[in-house]
Amino acid sequence: MSDTESLNDALGLFDEPEDFRPEKPKEHYANYERIDVPDISKSKITNLKLQLVGSSPLWGHLLWNAGIYTARHLDKYPELVSNKNVLELGAASALPSLVAGLIGAKRAVVTDYPDADLMANIQYNVNTIIPDELKENVRVEGYIWGNEYDPLTIHLDGDKKFDLIILSDLVFNHNQHDKLLQTTKDLLATNGKALVVFSPHRPHLLEADLQFFETCKEYGLTPEKIEMVNWKPMFEEDEETAEVRSRVYAYYMTHA
């Protein structure tokens, strides 16, 4: 046996078995049903088959209660988005933006962290759910909170502000509150609204979640609580905290 053959055999000891690394989770799907489609909605599509990424460190692989609540809220109050400029931060599956596009947003800009899989997944949902005649009005953009706004406002055909900014299940990012609020302050139209919806996924940190609505005042924004409802919690593992985790909080924020 040659030295080369011996070396190759030795190196072969370190070859990974085919099943050594777990297979990357595949995308999966969730169905969302629009319960009350408003008369002014440009599309009467009711069933939305959402593709979700297989896994995500940013939790974009789940369809959260907050996203479902937000989508229903837009159908209930379509004037929030009809012929309006809409921005969604941290969109994940982009359900609220998709509903805004179906209702007839002038422009819906859907954003999330610029991860390739996440962006491709959002674009897939836009391509498969939004009718061709409305696709031009729904734009997908990777965005890191706190960065320059030009990549967002370039989609507005001359406008520089958004009539509605959607923050669905984002306030658990406590160290990002300032960036979220600065972005909201800077990009919200004078008479616009931000719609903030969340569930307390970590009940012991609920006060830190709610601090968002105190900190917003430092940015010249006024919070208005819409309601708190109880839905089925996303996870069943801890009965003691189930009630808190079942909560869905909804707020508006406007310029003071």
Curated annotation (Swiss-Prot):
Q: What class of enzyme is it?
A: transferase
A Gene Ontology biological process term: methylation
Q: Where is this region: Disordered?
A: 1-26
Residues annotated to bind S-adenosyl-L-methionine: W64, G90, A91, A92, D112, W145, S168
Principal location listed in the UniProt entry: cytoplasm
Q: Which UniProt keywords apply?
A: Cytoplasm, Methyltransferase, S-adenosyl-L-methionine, Transferase
Location(s), subcellular: Cytoplasm
Q: Name one GO molecular function term.
A: protein-lysine N-methyltransferase activity
Q: Which domain of life is it from?
A: Eukaryota
Gene Ontology terms: cellular component: cytoplasm
Matching InterPro entries: EFM7, Methyltransf_16, SAM-dependent_MTases_sf
EC number(s): the record gives: 2.1.1.-
Q: So what family is this one in?
A: Belongs to the class I-like SAM-binding methyltransferase superfamily. EFM7 family.
Biological role stated in the UniProt entry: S-adenosyl-L-methionine-dependent protein methyltransferase that trimethylates the N-terminal glycine 'Gly-2' of elongation factor 1-alpha, before also catalyzing the mono- and dimethylation of 'Lys-3'.
The identity of this protein, by name, is Protein N-terminal and lysine N-methyltransferase EFM7
